[in-house]
C-alpha cells in the first residue's frame, strides 16, 4: 500500500511528532512518502526514517489557489493509494480531495478540539467541503474528540484512533540531564514539575507561570521546567520576564524522555487540545499528570490514580489539583510508574490501526 502523509512542516508540535512516528512505523511494512509543504522550521526532520521518502515543496506561508493546483499535480505525480493530511494542511488539500476522490482515498486527522476549532469559520467549512464533496474520512484522536465530531458531523465517516508515541528511548545525555536538573533543585526533596509545549495562547502559559510564582513564593519546595519553542518571541519573552527564580525555560529538546525520566510530575495548563502528545509521553515515562480539563487529558488521566484534572480552567482550581498531588505524591507516582507500559498509546498499536483503516477503504474502492 502506497501512503502519502501531508504535513505543513516539522517544527515542534503534537501533530508533527505523530506524523514522524507514524511514518517511521508504517514504513516498516508500507510504502510511505512524507510531503512537507511549507518553508518552516523542520525540527523533527532528522528523526524521519530512511525508509520514508521525503518531498519538500518549499511553499511560501499562506493560502493561494495556485497552491491548491500544485497540491493536485503533486498527488497525481506521486500516485498514492492513500492521501492522509493533518489539520494544518486543510486548506491546501480541498481541491485535490474533491477532484481526485474517485481515484484516491483521502483521510484527515483532527488534532484539536472540535467544538472550538471545527464548528464554524474556515476550518468548519473545510471539513464540510471535504466530507460532503470529497468523501474524506476523518480520524479523531481521543474519546472526547470523537464524541464532539460525531455530534457536529454525524453523517461523515470517522474512526477513533488514539494518538501514539514511540516508546521511551533514552540518550547518552541522560546522566548530564540528571545532573542539570539536580543543579536546579533546592535539595533532594524538591518536587520537579515539567511542562512540555511550545509557546501559544491556547497553552495558557501565562496562568501557569503566575501560579508557580505564587507556589514558590509560598515556600512550596518545587521547581518548574519549561521545555518548548516560542519563548524567545515578543509575547513569549514577556512570560519569561514574569517568571521568578525556580522556573527554568530550557528551549526545545530532542531528548524529551531524558527530561521526563528525571522529573516528578508533568503539568499542562491548556485551554483546548485534541489529544496532547506531551501527555502520552508522560504516561509512557511513568510520571503523574496534572492538567486542566481539556479534550484528551480528561480521557487519559484518572483522578487520584495517575494524576489530577482540575475542575475548571481557573488558577485556583488548578492550584487545588497541584496541592492534592503534593499531598498524595507517593501513591500517585507509584501507580503511574506501574502503568507506564500502556500499549494503548504505543505507536505500534496506533500505526496498525491506521493501516487497517486505510486498507479497508482501498478494498471498498476496488
List PLM regions with ranges.
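N-terminal strand-loop element at the rim of the active site
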Residues: 5-65, 145, 160, 230-232
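Acidic anion/phosphate-binding donor-loop and adjacent secondary structure
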Residues: 150-151, 162-183
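Aromatic "clamp/platform" in nucleotide-sugar-dependent glycosyltransferases that forms part
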Residues: 252, 271
Amino acid at each position: 500500500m502506497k501512503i502519502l502523509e501531508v504535513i505543513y512542516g516539522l517544527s515542534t508540535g503534537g501533530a508533527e511528532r505523530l506524523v514522524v512516528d507514524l511514518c517511521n512505523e508504517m514504513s516498516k511494512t508500507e510504502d510511505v512518502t512524507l510531503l512537507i509543504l511549507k518553508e518552516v522550521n523542520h525540527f523533527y526532520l532528522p528523526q524521519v526514517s530512511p525508509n520514508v521518502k521525503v518531498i519538500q515543496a518549499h511553499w511560501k506561508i499562506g493560502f493561494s489557489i495556485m497552491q491548491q493546483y500544485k497540491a493536485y499535480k503533486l498527488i497525481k505525480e506521486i500516485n498514492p493509494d492513500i492521501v492522509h493530511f493533518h489539520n494544518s494542511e486543510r486548506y491546501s488539500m480541498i481541491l485535490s480531495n474533491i477532484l481526485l476522490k474517485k481515484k484516491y482515498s483521502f483521510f484527515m486527522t483532527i488534532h484539536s478540539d472540535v467544538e472550538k476549532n471545527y464548528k464554524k469559520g474556515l476550518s468548519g467549512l473545510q471539513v464540510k467541503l471535504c466530507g460532503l464533496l470529497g468523501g474524506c474520512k476523518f480520524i479523531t484522536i481521543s474519546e472526547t474528540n470523537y464524541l464532539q465530531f460525531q455530534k457536529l458531523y454525524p453523517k461523515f465517516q470517522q474512526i477513533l484512533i488514539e494518538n501514539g508515541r514511540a516508546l521511551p528511548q533514552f540518550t547518552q545525555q541522560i546522566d548530564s540531564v540528571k545532573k542539570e536538573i539536580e543543579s536546579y533543585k533546592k535539595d533532594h526533596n524538591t518536587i520537579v514539575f515539567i511542562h512540555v509545549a511550545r509557546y501559544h495562547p491556547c497553552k495558557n502559559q501565562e496562568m501557569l507561570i503566575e501560579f508557580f510564582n505564587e507556589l514558590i513564593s509560598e515556600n512550596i519546595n518545587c521547581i518548574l521546567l519549561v521545555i518548548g519553542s516560542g519563548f524567545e518571541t515578543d509575547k513569549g519573552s514577556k512570560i519569561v520576564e514574569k517568571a521568578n527564580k525556580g522556573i527554568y525555560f530550557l528551549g526545545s529538546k530532542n531528548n524529551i524522555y531524558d527530561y521526563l525520566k528525571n522529573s516528578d510530575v508533568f503539568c499542562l495548563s491548556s485551554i483546548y487540545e485534541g489529544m496532547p502528545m506531551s501527555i502520552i509521553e508522560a504516561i509512557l515515562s511513568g510520571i503523574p499528570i496534572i492538567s486542566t480539563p481539556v479534550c484528551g487529558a480528561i480521557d487519559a488521566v484518572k483522578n487520584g490514580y495517575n494524576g489530577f484534572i482540575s475542575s475548571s480552567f481557573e488558577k485556583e482550581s488548578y492550584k487545588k489539583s497541584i496541592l492534592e498531588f503534593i499531598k498524595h505524591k507517593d501513591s500517585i507516582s507509584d501507580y503511574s510508574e506501574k502503568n507506564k507500559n500502556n500499549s494503548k498509546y504505543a505507536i505500534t498499536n496506533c500505526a496498525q490501526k491506521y493501516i487497517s483503516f486505510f486498507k479497508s477503504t482501498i478494498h471498498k474502492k476496488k
